[in-house]
Amino acid sequence: TETFEEVAHEYMEGYIQQVPNCRLQEGAVEILRTLSEAGYSHSLLSAYHQQRLEEAVDYFGLRKWFIRLIGLNDYYAHSKVENGIKWIRELPFPRQEVVFVGDMLHDYEVARAMGVDCILLTCGHQSRNQLERCGVLVLDSLSEAADRLLN
């Protein structure tokens, strides 16, 4: 019988192998560029393993758009909330100026723990109905989120 740790590691190794087959959301690079030019900075907080997160970001050529990449040191997603709280304390601007954009209920939980606004996107694996129960703005795409931030 496999342990949870073995199953988690096996799952993530399979997931990692699929990164080259993944695509960015339509217009993602242009959206990052436009928001950066408008004065927004970007951080990436993920339940992905830190080293793998950096490799994936580099694979897609996105590192220049982020002031910080924050992943986990294991595969169990136990400390995404803790990492978010730590990061918000380190940011050089007030949390009222931070918007957490995510696509999962857990992203809402992290944003709430950080004390920041949250926008949830329906492009993940949770339904609009599930996301709307959080009581925050729910949009269908990254471009819609960018439009809201810019207008």
Task: Describe the residue ranges of each PLM region.
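Short amphipathic alpha-helix with an adjacent loop that forms part of the alpha/beta core around
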Residues: 145-151
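Short beta->alpha linker loops
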Residues: 23-27, 48, 75, 103, ...
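Phosphate- and divalent-cation-binding pockets in alpha/beta enzyme and binding domains
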Residues: 27, 52-55, 110, 130, ...
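Short, acidic loop-to-helix structural element flanking the phosphoryl-transfer center
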Residues: 13-44, 50-57, 81
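Conserved H-loop
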Residues: 63-67, 94, 139
